[in-house]
UniProtKB/Swiss-Prot annotation:
Mn(2+) 1 binds at residues 425, 530, 544. Its EC number is 3.4.11.9. PROSITE patterns: PROLINE_PEPTIDASE. InterPro entries: Creatin/AminoP/Spt16_N, Creatinase/aminopeptidase-like, Creatinase_N, Pept_M24, Pept_M24B, Peptidase_M24_C, Peptidase_M24B_aminopep-P_CS, X-Pro_aminopeptidase_P. It comes from Chaetomium globosum (strain ATCC 6205 / CBS 148.51 / DSM 1962 / NBRC 6347 / NRRL 1970). It comes from the Eukaryota. The lineage of its organism: Eukaryota, Fungi, Dikarya, Ascomycota, Pezizomycotina. Keywords: Aminopeptidase, Hydrolase, Manganese, Metal-binding, Metalloprotease, Protease. Catalyzes the removal of a penultimate prolyl residue from the N-termini of peptides. The keyword Manganese applies. Mn(2+) 2 binds at residues 414, 425, 544. This is Probable Xaa-Pro aminopeptidase P. It is an enzyme of class 3 (hydrolase). Binds 2 manganese ions per subunit.
Length: 624
């Protein structure tokens, strides 16, 4: 991981901050684009450019004399290596470490003004930060419409994609746009909303059954939409749409307008509402609570705007039967590629004594995946990590700067793919030599947590926040009556996953984030289950499956509530030599045996003639 000298960049940025018309003491540089995307296109990587830190999550704050970068536990190690001496690392979530918001407010004391590009920050965060700055003695938060990082970046800034947008046919989507619009309009009428303005790219893609490739690994395209009771307007670069997409949108009564006209139309909506001047409380324009501050300002602010959890996001998170079956099928094909890969990798390292680096291994896995039916591409950068690199939770191997895979060390592979019928995300941790007793114990405690959550049964209305501890319990203590381990991991246990959409999908998830306590899990949700353990500088372990939430039959029905459970769809065995059978209960061994039996059955006939892979699969799935 390379450290970038940011001195010249910061000097230029600070100069721009002092210019007439701007005149700010500090500036916030978020990770997101104008659509609050977690993963962004290269042209939107402003925070990475100005700080040198390339992780996917983080916020930079630059003042005239200081600079800070805040990120979460997944990236502490990486940020520590990439940030140069100009930067102070704020380790989010650690005791006595201020949030970036508190750090900014404190730095603004004495009547100072802090600026931000309003299109890159959500209005709830912006408004709360403005209050905090003023309470700390600062002048407040200023919307700076011209992004100040862009001129620092200059001609080196990548151009925005002009990739085509394609229709996702009903065979894969399971529901047409007209039906989705009808359901959305019912929700809007129920809540007396005048319109819903969509700004999240995956929500627009899902609603209109379109897919693009403007952001690497995410099949989305730059777009907005406005839906009222009588109209639906898609704002997109019209030249990207082919005849099939245009015809489909026309059939579903969708108007197409240029992407850049959204804010003009938003201001027109605000003007129309102002002119209406009714004595009754006006129906408001609904926007996502992740929507940008710029969008809210354009729509007239609090007078005409209500920020809500997106009804489109909620609907998208509950997959229909076609999407669920697609998830099952694409995970079988994905499992074929992964099993072939692990068998190949072991043969190369152990039998052929080959020298392979982490990138070469990741490239081989991608090549195997690409042979599977309906493969589109990867769903994120493959984390191919050996030894101490596996302790870096979101490690990214770089060509020419990565490690040689050590067969006597832990190897962690977190990878996923986009298929026309679904999205995959799976992590397996392996050892090709002789693991230590400590490594086997850690792996088995993580596995026990994975099994505990996979087999959990819970009443409808339960949140991911409430069941997070099931996956961590064995790291905390092996059992209630034995050794208190005192171990844990610094990431969520699970995230929602899209259907041929973003690999990280809200609003549901499993973990300690506040949002996971606000949204109940529902039948049709698809989530990851991925507990882990990381020994910095030594090794890392993570075991990740994707699972669907489904109704389960129970002997009783307390309070007439249905009960829910999980159906895992990942079809890849666990690393047998890392499992300490002495730590497993009889029930856990039986669960493993049933899981291995299912994998063998679903892989039957898929490796004909490939004796190496078949032998590896049979060995790894032998009964305990």
């Amino acid at each position: 991981m390379e450290t970038v000298n940011t001195t010249a960049r910061l000097t230029t940025l600070r100069s721009l901050m002092k210019e007439n018309g701007v005149d700010i003491y500090g500036i916030i540089v978020p990770s997101e684009d104008s659509h609050a995307s977690e993963y962004i296109a290269p042209c939107d990587g402003r925070r990475a450019f100005i700080s040198g830190f390339t992780g996917s999550a983080g916020t930079a704050v630059v003042t005239q004399d200081k600079a800070a970068l805040a990120t979460d536990g997944r990236y502490f190690n990486q940020a520590g290596k990439q940030l140069d001496g100009n930067w102070h690392l704020l380790k989010t979530g650690l005791q006595d470490v201020p949030t970036w918001q508190d750090w900014t407010a404190e730095a603004s004391a004495g009547g100072k003004t802090v600026g931000v590009d309003p299109s890159l920050i959500s209005s709830p965060i912006a408004e709360k930060l403005d209050e905090s700055i003023k309470k700390s003695g600062g002048a407040g938060l200023k919307a700076v419409s011209e992004n100040l990082v862009d001129p620092v970046w200059g001609s080196d800034r990548p151009a925005r994609s002009s990739n085509p947008v394609k229709l996702l046919i009903g065979k894969y989507s399971g529901k047409d746009t007209a039906a989705k619009l009808t359901e959305l309009r019912k929700e809007l009428e129920k809540k007396k909303a005048a319109a819903f303005v969509l700004s999240m790219l995956d929500e627009v893609a899902w609603l209109f059954n379109l897919r693009g490739s403007d952001i690497t690994y995410n099949p989305v395209f730059y777009s907005y939409a406005i839906v009222t009771q009588d109209s639906a307007t898609l704002y997109v670069d019209v030249s990207k749409l082919d005849d099939e997409s245009r015809s489909y949108l026309d059939q579903n009564k969708v108007t197409i307008k240029p992407y850049d006209t959204l804010f003009e139309d938003a201001k027109a909506l605000a003007s129309a509402a102002e002119a209406k001047g009714t004595s009754e409380a006006p129906r408001k324009y609904f926007v996502s609570n992740k929507g940008s501050w710029a969008l809210k300002l354009a729509l007239g602010g609090d007078k005409f705007v209500e920020e809500v959890r997106s009804p489109v996001g909620d609907a998208k998170a509950v997959k229909n039967d076609t999407e669920l079956e697609g998830m099952r099928q694409c995970h079988i094909r994905d499992g074929v590629a992964l099993i072939q890969f692990f068998a190949w990798l072991e043969d190369q390292l152990v039998n052929k004594k080959a020298v392979l680096d982490e990138v070469a291994a990741a490239d081989q896995l991608e090549a195997l995946r690409s042979k599977q039916t309906d493969f589109v591409g990867l769903s994120f950068d493959t984390i191919s990590s050996t030894g101490p690199n596996a302790a870096v939770i979101h490690y990214k191997p770089e060509p020419g700067a990565c490690s040689i895979i050590d067969p006597e060390a832990i190897y962690l592979c977190d990878s996923g793919a986009q298929f026309l019928d679904g999205t995959t995300d799976v992590t397996r941790t392996l050892h090709f030599g002789t693991p230590t007793a400590e490594q086997k114990k850690a792996y088995t405690l993580v596995l026990k947590g994975n099994i505990a959550l996979d087999t959990a049964i819970f009443p409808k209305g339960t949140t991911g926040y409430a069941i997070d501890c099931l996956a961590r319990q064995f790291l905390w203590a092996s059992s209630p009556f034995s050794t208190k381990q005192g171990l844990d991991y610094r990431h969520g246990t699970g995230h929602g996953v899209g259907s041929y959409l973003n690999v990280h999908e809200g609003p549901i998830g499993i973990g300690t984030r506040k949002q996971y306590a606000e949204v109940a899990l529902a039948a049709g949700n698809v989530l990851s289950i991925e507990p882990g353990f990381y020994e910095d500088g030594s090794y890392g372990i993570r075991i990740e499956n994707l699972a669907m939430v489904r109704e389960v039959k129970t002997e009783h029905s307390f309070g007439d509530k249905p009960f829910l459970g999980f159906e895992h769809v990942t079809m890849v065995p666990y690393c047998r030599k890392l499992i300490d059978e002495a730590l497993l209960t009889a029930e856990e061994r039986e669960w493993l045996n049933q899981s291995n039996k299912e994998i063998r059955e679903k892989m039957a006939g898929r490796f004909d003639g490939d004796q190496l892979t078949q032998a590896w699969l049979e060995r790894e799935t032998q009964p305990f």
